[in-house]
Amino acid sequence: AAMAVLESGEVIGSVSGGCVEGAIHEASLEVLKTKTSQSVTYGVSDDNAFAVGLTCGGTIELYIQYVDQSSFPDFADIAAKIEDKKAVAVATLVSAESGIGARIVLTKSDASGSLGNTQLDHAAIEGARALLNHGTTKTLKLGPNGENRMDDVSVFVESFAPAPRMIIFGAIDFAAAVARIGKFMGYYVIVCDARALFA
């Protein structure tokens, strides 16, 4: 899930389906004001969980990122890749002793950027590529030098993979129903029929 808050205060998208949107909006406005990205956590153990609207239980961890041309110069290129249906991932350092906000942008064949050291970069790229191959977004927990099974460093990997294809042969009533379901489930649906009238 993703949500953008513009300088005008306008909101695009949703993170929690309304549960903590008000608190996230306020935190986002603060990020816009200070131009400093931040991590926030809302959960049932927080004293203010009910106050911010987290009545459904659970925990939500968010990284609120300030984005403009100077802070995120790769943003337009990433958007173009997504528009062209090319797989791309962004690995952002969201928790560490230093370097918060550092990022690596990667495709299936190349990567640019750094999280601070070569070992951490290598581990993050390896983990992010595996997530990108499955179209999965997840936070990687690593050691400061990329060690596995540690949680000193958190790297949030956003994967933007093209939708899987569903090819339906035969343009009949049944195909129309399957196409609607396929599209609803996130597939890029193609219906093929040898009869020009129905294709």
Where do the PLM segments sit?
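Segments forming oxygen-rich coordination pockets for charged ligands
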Residues: 1-199
